[in-house]
Amino acid sequence: MIKLDFLTWKNNHSSNPHVVFNGDNMDVLKKLHAMYDKQVSCIYIDPPYNNGEKYTYYSDALSHENWLKQMKTVLTELKEFLKEDGSIWISIDDGEMHYLKVLCDSVFGRKSFVATVIWQQRNTRENRKAFSNNHEYILVYSPDPELFKKRRNLLPVTEDVLARYQNPDNDPRGPWQSVTVNVQAGHAVASQFYEIVAPNGKVHTPPNGRCWIYNQDRMEQEIAKGNIWFGSDGNGVPRAKKFLKDRAPGVVPETLWLSSFVGTNKDAKTHLQALKIYNKDIFDTPKPETLIGQIIEISTNENELVMDAFLGSGTTISAAHKLNRKYIGIESEPQTCEYVMQRMEQVVAGETGGISKKVNWAGGGEVQFVI
């Protein structure tokens, strides 16, 4: 770990940032504009949710108006750092989510909205309330959503998706899955209504209100090519074969992120406790590295710049470091920065929690702390 004052860091390290600033986020951001405006590919923030709770390191109980005012100030400042194809991801819960959405529409522009991700942040039932609240939100905005769409990364194909591809007929083209060849008939033409005779003689017609996806000539061509499956007995309802070799190398991110894939608050606490640096003063609602890692993998490539202006327990920079991204973290509390410093010492040494096994993390690199 390297401790520096701002001027020394600016003169010697700012071109390749792996840095944490201890200071008020607005003060720090104003100092960084000249160096990093329109240079950041991904901003993730986990701001106070304004839910009235008193947490270990801060009180989350501003008036609604003051919270919105502070958020507007910070978001307006952060907006200037984003590349045109970059994105900002903002965690929030039900209490202020809809107000924050309207505020973000105002700051970034309604056309800059990309998605609302729903994260299953707990998988146990809360019995003390009228409803068990098991989710939070992540609002996603980009200066240019179309450019973001072109540059965003697909997620890896999961084992359960790969398991859908089989090869029951030993097709030399390899594993495949079957999909329906009938569609809603709302805009159908006459050539999409006809009989299909299966190899073993059974006649098939489209279900009521539906039509075949191809006209008869095209369907006969697909059958001749072996692209239509009639079941193991040759009489089943026709379905198209889609081969694993032809599918995209990944999957488009969805807006529902289940805990089984990206973890929970409890998983994050378990990870932090395993580091043995937080004692009893554990962070109340930390985010898991698997969640932040997925955000970073979708929105950035290696050596691109990630920013977090509400650094907290340091999960964003820990994930970014393991994924070989540059990063800027800002945290106002000196004690919290001490915790983050100890955490990053373990990351550099090759700690094995969080996303380490997934990305084959073995340690390395350095982190600068500017105080």
Regions found by a protein language model. Give the residues of each.
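Class I S-adenosyl-L-methionine
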Residues: M1-L305, C337
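S-adenosyl-L-methionine
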Residues: K10-K31, E345-I371
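Short glycine/serine/threonine-biased micro-segments
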Residues: F21, E84, F310-G312, G363
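Conserved S-adenosyl-L-methionine
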Residues: H64-L68, M97, T285-K358
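Extracellular structured ligand-interaction cores
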Residues: E136-I138, F193, N324-Y327, E366
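A glycine-rich phosphate-binding loop feature that marks nucleotide/adenosyl-phosphate handling sites
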Residues: G236-A240, G312, N360-Q368
